[in-house]
């Protein structure tokens, strides 16, 4: 992304995902599925999803960075609600192979032309961040007014320099814990709800409602982060996962609809807000020419956490015959992720638009 820009990265993602979906129907061995739906589609989704979008959206928006990213990532929920039922109907009527071909063609036809319109920075097409007017010819652009730590912001942050700071590792730890908690519950909640007494249909609908609730949650919390700061919204989102885990634990003793809806609302409306500020936190601490490589490396920690969460949760269930300890661990790691983001303290480098008026002229 730092060298080639979003069009190359996104179109690579389209090619990988399209190839994986179109080749999957030709599989004859299990490893064929691992390669097509696992490696190719999985790799494509990394380029096209949260990681890919977060690599260039922060360049386009400063004052409304959280809102912009919340709107972008809310599309995941919209896609889940609209496309998954269609895919299910197609699988039931024509089989999974036909469904893969249809989805592969849809990905290629829709995303290839759309991604050709992408640019890394607004300056590449004569614009300014947030839609501001460009300065007159010969007049330098006014420097950003949201910088708190001028010495830190003046550094040309490379990946190597970033990795030698405590902030980098606090972010990595926070992202690991955050995605551990997210994917641990997302992968196991349907099975758990059936286990405590809900019907398979209700359990499946609960997961769908979480995605639905996440749409306004991501947008609202992204906007809120532009007003009060990234740390506070990360705290609210992590609290959502803590409440979600506590509700799941209580459901074991009292499987009521009220607790089910509390779990859904906490996870969707609050928890999904994490995605709205993933890129913003890193951009405000390590903004610069090498932001892409820094963010991409930090997302490795997030991906490892997202993979570890479901695996550890499943292993503990197999060992103990219960999800209780695993859910307590998820809740605890949500709390630790909050501590880590506060320690990284993006507000001490650059403040959000809603706090700019509180800045007093100073240098670090």
PLM segments and residue spans:
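Hydrophobic core of transmembrane alpha-helices in multi-pass small-molecule transporters
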Residues: 20, 32-48, 176, 258-273
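Extracytoplasmic gate region of multi-pass secondary transporters
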Residues: 160-223, 309, 313
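Helix-loop-helix hairpin linking two adjacent transmembrane segments in secondary transporters
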Residues: 76-124
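C-terminal ends and interior cores of transmembrane alpha-helices
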Residues: 15-28, 240-253
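Interfacial helix-cap and linker-helix signal at transmembrane-aqueous boundaries
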Residues: 1, 82-94, 193-194, 224-225, ...
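Intracellular juxtamembrane helix-capping segments at the cytosolic ends
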Residues: 45-61, 273-286
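C-terminal membrane-cytosol helix-exit motif in multi-pass small-molecule transporters
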Residues: 104-146, 340-345
